[in-house]
Amino acid sequence: PSVLFFHGGMWVGKSLGDFVPWALHLAQQGIAGIIPMFRTRGDYEVEPMDILEEGREAWAWVHGNAALLGLDPARITVAGSDAGGLMALHVALPDHPARWSLFRKKAPLPPGPAAVALFRGVCDLTAQSAFKLGGMMPPDQRDAVNPLRRVQRGLPPLFASHGGRDRLLPWRNSERLAELWRKKKNRSRFELLDVADHTFYHFNVNAAYFEQLLNSWSAFMVEQGIWEYNEGMDAGLLG
């Protein structure tokens, strides 16, 4: 199994290192981590759709080269934080059928990911907290790519997590997405860390939160049959 991690930074800053601890710990369990580079508005003259499509292109490349990389194409998960979470959702969710003309004519995407994992991901582009992203788009384009408008049956399992004291991206939207996921007969789990803030998933900020989240995510993935249980998952990181 493997995970394709899309970093956060709200498409302004580069946060490539955020998921390195995750990739390193998962590697010890036999799970490969991939952290792609993509253009951001902070460094390039790109539009939101350019960035979202680069996420899909990364997914298509990894899936198409799975054999070369030694990966099982049926067990590749997509994950991300804030805007990277939006990219992961854009990979997993089908295009809004009424808005097909907004999307470029690209080669068909490969089959969807095995699962989606969000670490305080952007779920609703109409929310004030997501204005830095949704405000960059024309209203019709924003509505077409808004994850909450694209949830339907037949989606991969979703693991969504958030800090209860996140003042930048309130946790209610993550909970709402997980509930809507289940309402459409898909499997999901929402993990709320009550007293954690926006930085809750960073290993170098709070190792205890990191371990709690890693254990919960691992258990969920084992339940879905995507990851295989091994004793190292229960060993703990803090001793």
PLM features per residue range, with description:
Residues 1-9:
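Short beta-strand element of the alpha/beta-hydrolase
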Residues 2, 27-37:
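A fold-wide structural signal in alpha/beta-hydrolase
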Residues 15-22, 34-73, 206-210:
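Catalytic nucleophile-loop/oxyanion-hole region of alpha/beta-hydrolase
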Residues 57-132, 142-143:
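Primarily recognizes the serine-hydrolase "nucleophile elbow" in alpha/beta-hydrolase
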Residues 125, 165-169:
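Acidic catalytic loop of the alpha/beta-hydrolase fold
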Residues 147, 156, 170-180:
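Short alpha-helix in the alpha/beta-hydrolase fold that links the catalytic acid
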Residues 154, 159-162, 166:
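Short beta-strand/loop motif that positions the catalytic acidic residue
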Residues 175-178, 182-239:
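C-terminal catalytic histidine-bearing segment of alpha/beta-hydrolase fold enzymes
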